Amino acid sequence: MAAEIICVGTEILLGDIVNSNSQYLAQEFAKLGISHYFQSVVGDNIARIHSLLEIAVQRGTEIIVFTGGLGPTPDDLTTEAIAAYFQTPLIERPEIVADITTKFAQRGRTMTPNNRKQALLPEGAEILPNPTGTAPGLIWQPIEGLTIFTFPGVPGEMKRMWQETAVPYLKAQGYGQIVIHSEMMRFRGIGESSLAAKVNHLFALTNPTVAPYASKGEVKLRVAARAESVAAAKKLMDPVVAEIKAIAGLDYFGSDGASLPLVIGDLLRTRQETLAVAESCTGGGLGALITSVSGSSDYFLGGITAYANAVKINLLGVNSADLQNQGAVSETVAQQMALGAKQALDSDWGIGITGIAGPKSDDSAKPIGLVCIAWADPQNHVFSHTYRYGTDRDRELIRYLSACDALDGLRRYLKSDKS
């Protein structure tokens, strides 16, 4: 079963709004076992909508889901375009007019004449009710082997209509007997090409499938399988997932929603240990990542943003001679910051970060992207590492990667039980 998504709206093309509808519908297709290979965005233009319909029909698409362009204004052209393409007249549906009139009355308003446009559907189309808005959608089979759905572009309206009407309709047609289940495996400390080389033999699999994805600050592998149930799909996937974990080792940190801050929190909570941080170049970004997890106060005591050298000396106990001789960006200073945070806040673990995020460097001998990170364990053993993110990356990315590597380094120490 081949389906595709066509999102209509010039505002999407201009980047004025984020197209979250495609992501949602793609995930819903997978739950119903419906494969889809194409997504398109088109402006409010009948000729361009026709061109996409022509392509979809020619390649034998069986389900087309449109979102957007169903409202009462002149630029809402989706229904008109679909009807014209299949040379079918538009018929005003009195039940839709009545529904729109009622909704206006409930809001203490009178329906304006242009709203009647939303009651026009192609002859033979089934109404797809909109419980909250005034623009209904449609379900229509204009030619043999093709079903068209239309939905408003408003995500909340679209999602409710999909769940309450489209999903039951599709299940009644026999869809949903096969599901597509997937697991997004997440990795740190290894590049996409390096990971791909290690698992290259798995890319030839057909069920389950394995596909790599690059993401900000991490690499992902999507393992997916088709089966009659989620449990059956997982049974197909489990050996492959286990093999990937064995190959990746500590570079694998979790799957799906298991973010680095969440993983760190679980590890610290399990060990009943606490964390404090001292930050310079990240300016509180590390603390922000940690506290993005609800309940992080169970293990995160706090942080000190020590941007000035005087703060490093007075609050963290960094040796002034080391600052003078080695500079603020050095592993020696990062180590003292980690110990200083740990001692100042009486935590089990401490992290210190100092670096040059750019766009300029105050030290000609130290390039932009040079960051030193240190970790102090419960026994006051200190570990450190120097990262070189490159001079071509922007300030915010360097700060973000630094915070992520600080967490990832702690994760590796905790997982290796080096404390």
From Swiss-Prot:
Pfam annotation, one family: MoCF_biosynth
Recorded family membership: Belongs to the CinA family.
Matches recorded under InterPro entries: CinA, CinA-like_C, CinA_C, CinA_KH, Competence-induced_CinA, MoaB/Mog-like_dom_sf, MoaB/Mog_dom
Protein name, UniProt field: CinA-like protein
PANTHER family to which the protein is assigned, alphabetical: NICOTINAMIDE-NUCLEOTIDE AMIDOHYDROLASE PNCC, NMN AMIDOHYDROLASE-LIKE PROTEIN YFAY
Top-level lineage group: Bacteria
